[in-house]
Amino acid sequence: YGKSKLMAEQFLDSIGNEFNYIVLRPTGVYGPREKDYFLMAKSIKQHVDFSVGFQRQDITFVYVQDVVQAVFLALDHGMSGRKYFLSDGNVYQSSTFSDYLHEELGKPWWIRVKAPIWVLRLVTFFGEHIGRMRHTITALNNDKFNILKQRNWRCDIEPACDELGYHPHYDLRKGVTESVAWYKENHWL
């Protein structure tokens, strides 16, 4: 969970009932215009699938249109102070996303590179410092390291389903198919 998001939640909790709020905690958000997961598609199109860690990683995803659905449902049905995880309701191994991208891109030849976590730590350390020098936020920073090193991103979306009426319409395969189609139509790939 990003540091700034956690701090925002802690602030809201500290002011109690003075302010009405609902917290949505979307897991790996992907889809049209999203850039972090797009970089994976671009890398695979360039024949490299890069991942880190040698232990199994369970991860969850949510397509951007399902996040939009949840926002409107929260506005209509949510109770102030409640917090809801959002995903498509499934748990995937980390390689599943790149496998689906590979299929949608027409199965170009590729090299799968798997590096130890400490390599990611070095990359994110330097990425963070380069970003500070350039006054920009880089995709690979210390926050991203804390996210990517985790091996279990399972979450329970039942409260969102029960209380908001949230029902995701996109599983990962369908969402990746639409994302890659959008990337191609809009000349991102």
Question: What is each PLM-predicted segment?
Answer:
Residues 19-39:
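Flexible, glycine-rich beta-alpha linker
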Residues 64, 99, 124-166:
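Conserved C-terminal active-site "lid" loop/helix of NAD(P)H-dependent oxidoreductases
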